[in-house]
């Protein structure tokens, strides 16, 4: 597989440091508010990427962090708790971390290898800062804050393709109090009365954002690891500063081989943001659409390009999801009607080949999703009509390939139906088949209507009848 590496601005063959082991880190949320569909795009992409690697035989160690102490969290605590904020601020990140896990489950995102929190790793961060000060890459300000000195690192700006001179020209003429250079950034922030704090050799305070991710990623994955990812808005300054810190601490040019970034989510051409009032939370979206619909909607845009969010796209994706389930349900039943040998060749292999070819070319999910959906429609329009002309082995092979493709996209995650429901529906369908043979069509139609009322749709193919479930109804 070739993947675009932001660090080199090139498509590169994806090769891990350890064969069949992929180690990756994705910057997680700052849990001060509800996760929105823009967050969902990032984590669904890396979930699909992880699923693809696992399908290729890799063990994947994916780490996602939580920045569970931050100015935004402190401000939200003050809004909610007033004078009690100092004691109750942890309730804010705990609430939104719980929501993150709930929404991840509803989006069928597989659990990460680890979910480190900043507040659980402060001691390690203090240790890093000590080392950076000793090496001459960091300095202490009069108020006790500690800053990283950007000018001490060769080739600063390598990830974002910016020269330090150009960055300086765009920065403030006078640095903030305590800074030697406007581009220098905080490794340790001094305590402000009323805010949470931790002990350090310099002053009570808390870690800086850029330090946090590099400490937690390397703690869980080692140095160097295979890929580091996040939204495109993190390229500068966050990921640029992570590289600078790691270069100073470890003496390596790049502590991750591939830097993978996901494009913005837009609404009517504008970036989704709280300041513009155009944010759609995942809870809101998932109250109207299935997790598979959101995954398919994300897949229809290439990960590196901006994605225009609209309910029209989600409507289309929901219909695609229904078709995908129909193909699965009915082909699973049709296997029993297949013959002993192939009397007719079916051209389903091209969908499979082009699906994987698309993913191998910079993980092009729009083309992959198109091929997978094409196979679903081919199953319904052709395979089911010719099931008696192909062998059971061929039918099972088609079903197996279909499920493998679906598992990479994560769009057949509700395929299991309770056994007692399956048996009851099957019995009703058998009774209806007898009624049709006896030409008792009014009673047969009555059974069809009653089944439809509980979310079971019947499709007749001559004398054969297959059924599919409308997921999300009371059957589930």
From Swiss-Prot:
The keyword Cytoplasm applies. Binds 1 zinc ion per subunit. GO terms for molecular function: ATP binding; cysteine-tRNA ligase activity; zinc ion binding. CDD domains: CysRS_core. ATP binds at residue 274. It catalyses: tRNA(Cys) + L-cysteine + ATP = L-cysteinyl-tRNA(Cys) + AMP + diphosphate. GO terms for cellular component: cytoplasm. Keywords: Aminoacyl-tRNA synthetase, ATP-binding, Cytoplasm, Ligase, Metal-binding, Nucleotide-binding, Protein biosynthesis, Zinc. Its main location: cytoplasm. It holds the Pfam family DALR_2. GO terms for biological process: cysteinyl-tRNA aminoacylation. Zn(2+) binds at residues 27, 213, 238, 242. Its EC number is 6.1.1.16. A motif ('KMSKS' region) lies at residues 271-275. It is found in: Cytoplasm. It is an enzyme of class 6 (ligase). The keyword rRNA processing does not apply. A motif ('HIGH' region) lies at residues 29-39. It comes from the Archaea. Its cofactor is Zn(2+). InterPro entries: Cys-tRNA-ligase, Cys-tRNA-synt_Ia_DALR, Cys-tRNA/MSH_ligase, Rossmann-like_a/b/a_fold, tRNA-synt_1_cat_dom, tRNAsynth_Ia_anticodon-bd. NCBIfam families: cysS. Belongs to the class-I aminoacyl-tRNA synthetase family. This is Cysteine--tRNA ligase.
């Amino acid at each position: 597989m070739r993947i675009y590496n932001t660090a080199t601005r090139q498509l590169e063959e994806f090769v891990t440091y350890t064969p069949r082991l992929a180690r990756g880190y994705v910057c997680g949320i700052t849990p001060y508010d509800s996760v929105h569909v823009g967050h969902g795009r990032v984590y669904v992409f890396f979930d699909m990427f992880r699923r693809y690697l696992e399908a290729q035989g890799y063990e994947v160690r994916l780490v996602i962090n939580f920045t569970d102490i931050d100015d935004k969290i402190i401000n939200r605590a003050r809004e909610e708790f007033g004078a009690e904020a100092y004691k109750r601020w942890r309730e804010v990140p705990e609430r939104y971390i719980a929501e993150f896990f709930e929404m991840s489950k509803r989006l069928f995102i597989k659990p990460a290898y680890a979910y480190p929190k900043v507040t659980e790793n402060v001691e390690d961060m203090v240790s890093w800062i000590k080392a950076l000060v000793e090496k001459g890459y960091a300095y202490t300000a009069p108020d006790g804050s500690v800053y990283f000195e950007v000018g001490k690192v060769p080739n600063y700006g390598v990830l974002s393709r910016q020269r330090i001179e150009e960055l300086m020209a765009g920065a403030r003429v006078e640095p903030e109090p305590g800074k030697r250079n406007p581009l220098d950034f905080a490794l340790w922030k001094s305590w402000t009365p009323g805010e949470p704090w931790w002990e350090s050799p310099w002053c009570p305070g808390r870690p800086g954002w850029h330090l946090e991710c590099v400490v937690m990623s390397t703690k869980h994955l080692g140095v160097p690891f295979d890929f580091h990812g996040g939204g495109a808005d993190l390229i500068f300054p966050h990921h640029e500063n992570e590289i600078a810190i790691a270069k100073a601490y470890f003496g390596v040019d790049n502590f991750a081989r591939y830097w993978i970034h996901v494009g913005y989510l837009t609404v009517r051409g504008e970036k989704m943001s709280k300041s513009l009032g155009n944010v759609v939370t995942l809870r809101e979206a998932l109250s109207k659409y299935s997790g598979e619909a959101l995954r398919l909607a994300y897949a229809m845009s290439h990960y590196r390009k901006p994605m225009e969010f609209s309910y029209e796209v989600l409507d289309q994706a929901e219909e695609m999801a229904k078709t995908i389930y129909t193909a699965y349900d009915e082909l699973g039943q049709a296997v029993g009607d297949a013959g002993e040998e192939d009397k007719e060749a079916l051209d389903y292999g091209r969908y499979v080949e082009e699906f994987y070819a698309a993913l191998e070319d910079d993980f092009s999910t729009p083309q992959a999703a198109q091929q997978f959906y094409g196979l679903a429609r081919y199953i319904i329009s052709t395979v089911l009509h010719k099931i008696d002309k192909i062998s059971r082995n061929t039918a099972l092979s088609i079903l197996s390939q279909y499920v493998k493709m679906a598992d990479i996209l994560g769009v057949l995650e509700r395929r299991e139906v309770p056994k007692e429901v399956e048996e009851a529906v099957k019995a009703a369908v058998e009774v209806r088949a007898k009624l049709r043979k006896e030409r008792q069509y009014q009673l047969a139609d009555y059974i069809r209507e009653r089944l439809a009322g509980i979310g079971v749709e019947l499709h007749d193919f001559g004398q054969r009848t297959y059924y599919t479930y409308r997921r999300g109804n009371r059957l589930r």
